[in-house]
Design a protein with these regions (language model features):
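The conserved catalytic core of RNA pseudouridine synthases
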Residues: 36, 58, 148-191, 196-198
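Short, conserved beta-turn/loop elements at beta-strand boundaries and strand-helix junctions
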Residues: 88, 120, 152, 166-170, ...
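Accessory RNA 3′-end/elbow-binding domains used by RNA modification enzymes
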Residues: 1-45, 49, 53, 115, ...
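Extended alpha-helical targeting/anchoring segments
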Residues: 130, 134-158
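Short, structured loop/turn "capping" segments at alpha-beta junctions
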Residues: 121-126, 188, 200-206
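Residue-level signal for inorganic ion chemistry
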Residues: 59, 80, 136, 190, ...
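Glycine/acidic-rich beta-strand-loop module
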Residues: 42-72, 141
Length: 301
């Protein structure tokens, strides 16, 4: 007789995991491991970190995957190390060296002036090896296929580009910096452009994301820590409360939402969370033509 199958592991509760991604893993690698740790296929990630980068990566579990496309993650902060003296095919340390330049006479003041030019509202050409789509195909896929890629500049905002330290080495200069920027900004492109401005070439040596939207490293856990204690960083109610404006409903209005009925507009900008009198989230909603329209229903099926 065949042995009976082990009981199926119950699905985890819905919510967010704030992961401190290690270097060398893709964002999809992190999702795959989180699926195993949490015992569910229903895991997704918001935003992407390059394999060389570390730091904050937001994962949705179970019904919380519905939140991922609506999270306001348009402001991000990084700790970066820029290497001046060589440019690479990928604008980071993983690419092949394209050019080298003399850094012996570059001064700290010149570096500060170059950084200032890259602060504020700027036009940035994304890195050629990036996920930007050109005629429906990712730029990195075109590069790997041997195509010459020309990506148009696009507007981004660099809110902060603060130099923390400068080290003059024998054949290059390393710059440690804090970069706070809008979504779509490539920090490795900042390194490339700083090196180009100084006439020596530049690339990104190291990158650590410390914040994305309202989520910070202070709440992040490593994958090894999650293995030991596979618990959510934020349950579904706490996740919505942390990431969206909140609208609390009385019992009658909450009942109307549960039955798919329209309720009056909230007078709030953008997407907000609808919470019942018990503090549980019912849906994400947005005002539209005088009513509150559900954008994502978060009630269990």
């Amino acid at each position: 007789m065949s042995s009976p199958k082990p009981p199926r592991r119950p699905a985890p509760p819905p919510g967010l995991l704030i992961v401190d991604k290690p270097a060398g893993m893709t964002s999809h690698d992190v999702v795959a491991r989180a699926r195993r740790i949490m015992g569910t296929r229903k895991v997704g990630h918001a935003g992407t970190l390059d394999p060389m980068a570390t730091g904050v990566l937001v994962l949705g579990i179970e019904r919380a995957t519905k939140l991922l496309g609506h999270l306001a993650l348009d402001r991000k902060t990084y700790l970066a190390t820029l290497s001046l003296g060589s440019s690479t095919t990928t604008d980071d340390a993983e690419g092949e060296v394209l050019t080298t330049g003399d850094t012996e006479k570059i001064t700290d003041d010149e570096i500060a002036e170059g950084v200032a030019k890259l602060t504020g509202d700027i036009q940035q050409v994304p890195s050629a090896v990036s996920a930007v789509k050109i005629d429906g195909k990712r730029a990195y896929a075109r590069v790997r296929a041997g195509e010459d890629v020309v990506i148009p500049a696009r507007p981004v905002t660099v809110y902060r580009f603060d130099v923390l330290g400068i080290r003059h080495e024998d054949d290059h200069v390393e710059v440690d910096a804090v970069v706070e920027c809008s979504s779509g900004t490539y920090v490795r492109a900042l390194a490339r452009d700083l090196g180009a401005d100084l006439g020596c070439g530049g690339h990104l040596k190291a990158l650590r994301r410390t914040t994305v939207g309202p989520f910070t490293l202070a709440r992040a856990r490593t994958l090894d820590q999650l293995e030991e204690t596979p618990e959510l960083s934020l349950d579904l109610d706490a996740a919505v409360a942390a990431a969206f404006p909140r609208r609390d409903l009385d019992a009658a209005t909450a009942k109307a939402v549960r039955h798919g009925q329209r309720i009056p507009a909230a007078g709030l900008d953008g997407t907000y969370g609808l919470f019942g009198p018990d503090g549980r989230v019912l849906a994400l909603a947005a005002d539209e033509q005088g009513v509150s329209r559900a954008v994502v229903v978060l009630l269990p099926a």
